[in-house]
């Protein structure tokens, strides 16, 4: 088994010359390699809808973790319910932070997402994912190279130093148009916020719509130097 510790033995390669640009092959390998010791960390963005559909074909009872920060858009929570109905066999886990919002306010002050967004992300996303990955050998992410400069070198299989795990990224070669073409082709549910200027959807407090011609992640932590929540640093 390929693990974080045995990374030097990595000789896995995949062709991207198929209908899913390698995604199905990558997922088939991942679930064969890790069996029950792999989880998909899903934010329920539009890429997530594609991955859930593909994963359901490979492993209908796969584990899916959603990092419920308690400050997501209502539309996101409603989408999760639709996904549960569409893919009833998937094991969707809504992972909560250890601190409630009230407890966080008492410890760190009101609106931590404004005063210290990095700490807020650590409490409400990074630490919960660490807990979710504690007993896993690998995890799946919907990263695409096209999304941003920080993601353009992502590979199908990555040694993830942040979580000392293997990170599997099946959609690295997909374009934004290809993602949407797949969603429409298979009549997949998606977050209606995508239709009103939100290409990337995170927490309600830190996500704004993006103007025409803007980068897909311009609406995340707008006005701040921050561009990533911290889950995807290599």
Swiss-Prot record:
InterPro entries: APS_reductase, PAPS/APS_Rdtase, PAPS_reduct_dom, Rossmann-like_a/b/a_fold. Its main location: cytoplasm. Belongs to the PAPS reductase family. CysH subfamily. This is Adenosine 5'-phosphosulfate reductase. One of its GO terms (biological process) is cysteine biosynthetic process. Binds 1 [4Fe-4S] cluster per subunit. CDD domains: PAPS_reductase (cd23945). One of its GO terms (cellular component) is cytoplasm. [4Fe-4S] cluster binds at residues 120-121, 203, 206. GO terms for molecular function: 4 iron, 4 sulfur cluster binding; adenylyl-sulfate reductase (thioredoxin) activity; metal ion binding; phosphoadenylyl-sulfate reductase (thioredoxin) activity. It comes from Bacillus thuringiensis (strain Al Hakam). It is found in: Cytoplasm. Catalyzes the formation of sulfite from adenosine 5'-phosphosulfate (APS) using thioredoxin as an electron donor. It catalyses: [thioredoxin]-disulfide + sulfite + AMP + 2 H(+) = adenosine 5'-phosphosulfate + [thioredoxin]-dithiol. Pfam families: PAPS_reduct (PF01507).
